[in-house]
Amino acid sequence: MKVLALRHSVAQVYADTQTYVHDDSKDEYENAFLISNLTTHNILYLNYSVKTLKILNKSGIAAIEIQSPDELFTLIRCNFTYNYENNTVYLHDYSYYTNNEIRTDQHWVTKTDITNYLLPGWKLTYVGYNGKNTRGHYKFSFICQNAATDDDIIIEYIYSNELDFQTFLLRKIKERMTTSLPITRLSNRVFRDKLFSSILNTHKKVINVGPRNESMFTFLNLPTIKQFSNGAYLVKHTIKLKQERWLGKRVSQFDIGQYKNMLNVITTIYYYYNLHFSKPIIYMLGSAPSYWIYDIKQYSDFTFETWDPLDTPYSTTHHKELFFDKDINRLKDNSILYIDIRTDRGNMDWKEWRKVVEHQTISNLNIAYKYLSTGKAKVCCVKLTAMDLELPVTTKLLHHPTTEVRSEFYAILDVWDVNTIKRFVPKGVFYAFINNVITENVFIQPPFKLKTSSNDYIVALYALSNDFNSRQDVINLINQQKQSLITVRMNNTFRDEPKVNFKNIYDWTFLPTDFETKGSIITSYDGCLGIFGLSISLSSKPTGNNHLFIINGTDKYYKLDQYANHMGISRRSHQIRFSESATSYSGYIFRDLSNNNFNLIGTNVENSVSGHVYNALIYYRYNYAFDLKRWIYLHSIGKANVEGGRYYEHAPIELIYACRSAKEFAILQDDLTVLRYANEIERYINIVYNITYADDPNYFIGIEFTNIPYEYDVKVPHLTLGVLFISDNMINDVITVLKKMKPELFKMEISTSYTYMLSDNIYVANASGVLSTYFKLYNMFYRSHITFGQSRMFIPHITLSFSNRQMVRIESTRLKISSIYLRKIKGETVFDMSE
């Protein structure tokens, strides 16, 4: 959903678009709530309130002021992520395909021969980090850039087994044009940048678990973050390999040697960060042309000092010369050294060339060892070739993708490796490594152990659900870690599957009720965005690849109606009710009937069940941005701080009724996951609320009327407004509550329209207009620790006779209250009040 705020209506009609005019009779929160439950994708918001826009954005719903037709046309035709704190829009718009154009935000790609393999007549355009170079295309009242690129296709091709790039590109573009937009992947880079800068403003020590290559630029400027990944491939791991021969396989049609070198250096940078938590100087030998340095400098300001007889245009300091052993003393501490020296083969015979390469490999290793043998805070990444070698057993082996699989690979060494025991590795084993192992991640840090860290803020995005982790250990970490943002895969199955297949692994699935957290927010991706200053135009869909975002230790926990709130809670219900269901009242009818309340007159205005909780349960796959457990808990302890809107505090029994309705809904839908979720939410309600029932009552509250439009044979027909189980010394407490409620009690617009047999020999009249006041009265008694109401649903009725009678229907008749009293069952009246 996107909300585009206009001062004036527009003449043009757009598909999937609805107009909402600000309702001045309602406050900004109520307007925001009504907007959020509209069912179209585009909302044109007229006569808008800036505060309402702010409320929507905090809820993760993109809402932007529009000042021109061009702004409207641009935003209505595509999806986007919005940084509402600095008024920047990141478009995810692929309409540039109509210019016969693909885009990249990695400069090195433009220096390859990739254009020879594009679709006929197509070109490649460099657009800068997150499309920053496109800002000049949009002369808008807000900052706007198009973050959409085709780097995902290019990178997927590089790691695939396919060689024909044009065929691969064509298939992927067609897929993109015929499937829904992977909105979270597109906005994730924007989110990660905002997230980690926000966290580091308030937390000095941050742990990040499970980063992948898509984050490789994000953390270049954040050296103090401690990374955990899947670990490195070490020399000692080669013992499992069987010897092989040279393969000579082509990986890419266009030259990706630049990409390989960039990955090698970035891997080394992050390895250095995890040791020293600061930025190193970067020395490079055999550096030309290293166009990728430009890419790294777009994200962070590194000092590159390079040696090569050829130019290295983006280096900070370039020595246009060869590097010799005597130059090692020029290399400072707090640095990394990348050795990529190799002489061109020219016309050399392959045997002679092989000797040169092996000699150069030994020379490269000697430079590395000498560099690491003195000084401090040093890491080296060195090019090696498959040959008989002795290497430290803790050497980290790298084999990032390159244009052709030949004989080369790389090794990362640190000052500790130099003094570690060495192992002889034969040439054939190195070929087995080269032929079979691809380094898929620039993050080669050790795996994260599922233990709390009291002084650290832990971030684990899409990293802990894998079934090689203990599910209970993941739950324990989330329950016990004081400060964190952790995601887990949401249980989106209908059979309540404990784990699901994802790509080539299995993930555990989770529901919010799996966690016993207090002070945590459990929400969706878009709900989490709102907490960190972003919003999005396309809300999470139940794709099966959905995650719960669990935020521990946030100062926004008590801001119940601002973040992870109830915005959009009824949107899915509206979509169904007004398009597919038997009636738009179907939800109200079902909730009453499933709780044995058969009086459906006015069910849409006087329902006996919490619609919020019911919708949050049965449609949790669509509206899990709303943190239901937090909402229940804060109400239970009386700390539901609400800024605005039509606020109605539910009685705890209404929440129980909602769970019962949701369970029956789940049974009818054969939805075992909702069934368990509803059961567990009901159990949670009973834990946080101390609900007691007057199932063996000794007092009741009665209402007498001046007019009863039916025949009756009881002495005085009355409406029982509720029963109590109290001791005699609590009578005054009950009377105090009744006196406080007196104005509302006498304002009740009670009416009746039919009679029926409540049970054998009990003939009653229905009573409408009672429930909302009953639940308010229930809440007041609950807060006063007075047992009021039974475990079965309260059905308002007036007893007319204790004999069988025929049903009577009349026009709805208003009943006037004459008195309200408290009476002991089979005893005397102890309190009576009249208007």
UniProtKB/Swiss-Prot annotation:
EC numbers on record: 3.1.4.-, 2.7.7.50, 2.1.1.56
Domain of life: Viruses
Gene Ontology CC annotations of this record: viral nucleocapsid
Annotated region (2'-O-methyltransferase activity), positions in chain: 246-428
One GO molecular-function entry: mRNA guanylyltransferase activity
One of the GO biological process terms: viral process
A family per Pfam: Rotavirus_VP3
PROSITE patterns: SAM_MT56_VP3
Annotated region described as 2'-5'-phosphodiesterase activity, given as residue ranges: 693-835
Coiled-coil intervals, chain numbering: none
Keywords, sorted A to Z: GTP-binding, Host-virus interaction, Hydrolase, Inhibition of host innate immune response by virus, Methyltransferase, mRNA capping, mRNA processing, Multifunctional enzyme, Nucleotide-binding, Nucleotidyltransferase, RNA-binding, S-adenosyl-L-methionine, Transferase, Viral immunoevasion, Virion
Region (N7-methyltransferase activity): 171-245, 429-555
Catalytic reaction annotation: a 5'-end diphospho-ribonucleoside in mRNA + GTP + H(+) = a 5'-end (5'-triphosphoguanosine)-ribonucleoside in mRNA + diphosphate; a 5'-end (5'-triphosphoguanosine)-ribonucleoside in mRNA + S-adenosyl-L-methionine = a 5'-end (N(7)-methyl 5'-triphosphoguanosine)-ribonucleoside in mRNA + S-adenosyl-L-homocysteine; 5'-triphosphoadenylyl-(2'->5')-adenylyl-(2'->5')-adenosine + 2 H2O = 2 AMP + ATP + 2 H(+)
Active site, UniProt feature: 718 (for 2'-5'-phosphodiesterase activity), 720 (for 2'-5'-phosphodiesterase activity), 797 (for 2'-5'-phosphodiesterase activity), 799 (for 2'-5'-phosphodiesterase activity)
Region feature (GTase/RTPase activity): 556-692
Subcellular location: Virion
Predominant location category: virion
Domain-related comment: Contains a bipartite N7-methyltransferase domain, a 2'-O-methyltransferase domain and a GTase/RTPase domain. The C-terminus contains a phosphodiesterase domain that degrades the 5'-triphosphorylated, 2'-5' linked adenylate oligomers produced by the host cell in response to IFN stimulation.
Similarity-based family: Belongs to the rotavirus VP3 family.
Function: Multifunctional enzyme involved in mRNA capping. Catalyzes the formation of the 5' cap structure on the viral plus-strand transcripts. Specifically binds to GTP and displays guanylyltransferase and methyltransferase activities. Has affinity for ssRNA but not for dsRNA. Capping activity is non-specific and caps RNAs that initiate with either a G or an A residue. Together with VP1 polymerase, forms a VP1-VP3 complex positioned near the channels situated at each of the five-fold vertices of the core. Counteracts the host innate immune response thanks to its phosphodiesterase that degrades the 5'-triphosphorylated, 2'-5' linked adenylate oligomers produced by the host cell IFN-inducible 2',5'-oligoadenylate synthetase (OAS). The host RNaseL is therefore not activated.
Subunit details: Interacts with VP1. Interacts with VP2.
Protein name: Protein VP3
